[in-house]
Every structure is written in structure tokens, then in C-alpha cells.
From Swiss-Prot:
Positions of the Nudix hydrolase domain: 29-160
EC annotation from Swiss-Prot or TrEMBL: 3.6.1.-
Protein's name in the database: Uncharacterized Nudix hydrolase NudL
Protein's UniProt keywords contain Calcium: no
Gene name per UniProt: nudL
PROSITE patterns reported for this sequence: NUDIX (PS51462), NUDIX_COA (PS01293)
Binding locations of Mg(2+): 83, 87
Entry's Gene Ontology BP terms: nucleoside diphosphate metabolic process
Cofactor(s) the protein needs: Mn(2+); Mg(2+)
Source organism of this protein record: Escherichia coli O139:H28 (strain E24377A / ETEC)
Phylogenetic lineage: Bacteria, Pseudomonadati, Pseudomonadota, Gammaproteobacteria, Enterobacterales
InterPro entries associated with the record: CoAse, NUDIX_hydrolase-like_dom_sf, NUDIX_hydrolase_dom, NUDIX_hydrolase_NudL_CS, Nudix_NudL
Enzyme kind, highest EC tier: hydrolase
Database matches in Gene3D superfamilies: Nucleoside Triphosphate Pyrophosphohydrolase
Span(s) of short sequence motif Nudix box: 67-89
């Protein structure tokens, strides 16, 4: 695939053709969800946020909108949509959910389900000042280019954990966010 020519139609057909295998076992993890917002354009974008530097956890990191599943959420999809509205003012009704990726275990004890959704290009994003310091869009073709990610093995509590690192403009994309983007690339058939 030529990355400069990634169209939304190609992305959608590949995503729907190669449905991810989901293991529904939760292993008593707390549940969380993130929205992977794909901006509907001829050359689609990927919406990301930079977390506020004042947050207790993951301060200043690039992330997808998302958070813990609340008792009021009907599902992980509902949680992802609620969090996206709270963090960057994306109305749930504006999101066309096309599926989910396999859940990812976080270092903070959550099982995080990435929810993939298509959003209109003209939404007026409004960052929640308490949680988000920046909202930016990365071309999806660049985000899914696996060559931009570099591995780093981190040792924590006697275990090795591989994390992925990348830069986009002034933003350092790494950890779970980079791992989810890589998983999305692999899901649509991008070869490492």
C-alpha cells in the first residue's frame, strides 16, 4: 500500500474485511475504553489529544479520548463516546462506530478497549481544560506507517514490556497510544 494514497474507502474496506479477534475475558481488570476518531476526509486523519500536564496519571502524554467505564455506561462503546464528548466535545451522535480492536492491558490495571469511529471533518473541537492541553490531527496514512515506530523494552517489577515510540511534529507518541495505532495498522493489513 502506498501510504500517501490511503483513502477512507480503502481503510474502511480493509478494517471490515479483517475483523479483529476479540477475547472477551476480562480477568477481573477494571474496564476502560478509548475512541480512535478517524476524520472523514478523502485523505483521512487521526484525531489525538495531549493530556494536561496537571493530571496525576499520564500527564502531558499523547492519547486518544477515553477513560474508565462508569456504572452509567451501557457498554465500552458508550464509555468511549461519553469520554470523547467530555474531553473534546465530540457529540456521540456524530460518531459512526465501525468496530473495536482487541482490548489492551494498561500498566495502571485497566483493560482498555479501543473503539474505532468515523467523525465529520468540520467538528468544532473544544478541549476540556482539566484533562486536555491540545487536540491535533495526524494524517492517517502517516499514523499507520509502521516504519515510524521504534521499540523500547522497559523492565518493570521483573517483567519486560515492549513499548513503541514515534514523533509527529512536536508530539511524542508512545506507549499504549502508539501500540494501539500499530495494532490498527496491522489490523488493516499493513506489513511490518
Amino acid at each position: 500500500m502506498e501510504y500517501r494514497s490511503l483513502t477512507l474507502d480503502y481503510f474502511l474496506s480493509r478494517f471490515q474485511l479483517l475483523r479483529p479477534q476479540i477475547n472477551r475475558e476480562t480477568l477481573n481488570h477494571r474496564q476502560a475504553a478509548v475512541l480512535i476518531p478517524i476524520v472523514r476526509r478523502p485523505q483521512p486523519g487521526l484525531l489525538l489529544t495531549q493530556r494536561s500536564i496537571h493530571l496525576r496519571k499520564h500527564a502531558g502524554q499523547v492519547a486518544f479520548p477515553g477513560g474508565a467505564v462508569d456504572d452509567t455506561d451501557a457498554s465500552v462503546i458508550a464509555a468511549a463516546l461519553r469520554e470523547a464528548e467530555e474531553e473534546v466535545a465530540i457529540p456521540p451522535s456524530a460518531v459512526e462506530v465501525i468496530g473495536v480492536l482487541p482490548p489492551v492491558d494498561s500498566v495502571t490495571g485497566y483493560q482498555v478497549t479501543p473503539v474505532v469511529g468515523i467523525i465529520p471533518p468540520d467538528l468544532p473541537y473544544r478541549a476540556s481544560e482539566d484533562e486536555v492541553s491540545a487536540v491535533f490531527e495526524m494524517p492517517l496514512a502517516q499514523a499507520l506507517h509502521l516504519g515510524r515506530y521504534h521499540p523500547l523494552d522497559i523492565y518493570r517489577r521483573g517483567d519486560s514490556h515492549r513499548v513503541w515510540l514515534s514523533w509527529y511534529e512536536q508530539y511524542f507518541v508512545w506507549g499504549m497510544t502508539a501500540g494501539i495505532i500499530r495494532e490498527l495498522a496491522l489490523q488493516i493489513g499493513v506489513k511490518p
